Amino acid sequence: MLLTLYLSYFLSKTKIYYEKGIYKIEGSISVLSKKYLVISNENNNILIYTSDLKNSTPLSLGDQVEIQGELNPIEIDNSKIATFYLQNNINYLLKKTVILTVIKPEFSVKEKIMNYSKNHGELFDSYWRLLVFGSYDSKELVLNKVNRLNIVHLIVISGLHFDLLFYLILLILKPLDKIKIKSKYVAFALIFYYLTLLANPVSALRAYIMQVVKNSNNPFSYNNKFKKYDGLLISILVLFLLKNNYLFSLSFILSFSSTFTIMLLVPMVKSKKLNNFLKTLILMTLIYLFNIPMLLYINEYWNYFGLLLGIIMAPLFQFFHLCSLLFWWSPTMLSWMYYLLDNLLYYLVEYTFALKINISINWWILIFWSSFWYLTIFFMKLKSNIKIWKIKTA
């Protein structure tokens, strides 16, 4: 993983470079929000703040544009800005920007989804698009609430969402097996198409690849099975090959580090003589503690009830995610559900205490914290193995 991170950083520097000045640039819109957009041009991504943009034509993802403005090399003020630039592969900031021409695609599924969502009110649009596709226009309605509750990682599309979705689709398609059509292949095809519609597919793609590996045969193994960590390693390699800058995204780091830690901890927790509920509770607590620095890096708030809220809200968000997918054709019902969820989040924010953290969390703190956990787990496993070896040789 360290090698792929280094290669990603190296490749991000092998670009076509421009000197500071006024340029006309052609490219496509790869990222779009209310505050900024990103233009892809000759393997360079160019950031434009919408407050600095002169344009009368509504813009959409995928639009081909010709723009003119003052091109400036990026300036990095802090680690969060650096992370944003790296994960989006941004090399330049364009100021005093004028859009000269806009060419829209003849048909866009994402545009149809956007219009459908916006046509059913602000509440539906804010929750439905966020829960189903991980996209949003404003943080005000939803994300600010979950940030203060330390549960923002639960509402966005994650690997767990995809695992549940895969098994649900597999259950629905099970009758296909009777007519000699492999239901799992149809399920993988449907989920792959869904993947292409996500605003940030990193975590979901990780889960998808791991499921594919889990349900495939390994031609290089004597028993045709992949080893425990093969799926995780293959997913890292695939993401690197698809887009090397994925490896700098917070989604990648949070998803892969959490998954790897869970895979290390599960055998240790399972070995304890406890019931399944307590084992699950212990595992969730350990993962929450492991992710504390990353959550503070993302949220800037510390909620004293964050662990309890995470345990309670995780299954609730899973339920809302599946309902949003299955009942997309009933915006009235979903709007009513979102109204209840929004009120629940409002009261949780009002009656739980969140402290704003002024400590600057940088990548060295995250690396040190992760290393401490992994070394601790390694020595605990080593101690356990030595104990087992002594018993066997006694």
Predicted regions and their residues:
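Membrane-interface helix/helix-cap signal primarily in integral membrane proteins
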Residues: 2-153
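Alpha-helical transmembrane segments
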Residues: 2-5, 263, 292-293, 319-323, ...
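C-terminal regulatory/interaction regions
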Residues: 4-17, 31-34, 333-394
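Divalent metal-coordination and catalytic microenvironments
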Residues: 69, 131, 158, 199, ...
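Cytosol/matrix-facing ends of alpha-helical transmembrane segments
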Residues: 98, 321-328, 377-382
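Hydrophobic alpha-helical segments of integral membrane proteins
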Residues: 105-120, 124-127, 131, 135, ...
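Hydrophobic alpha-helical transmembrane segments in multi-pass membrane proteins
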Residues: 144-307, 365-394
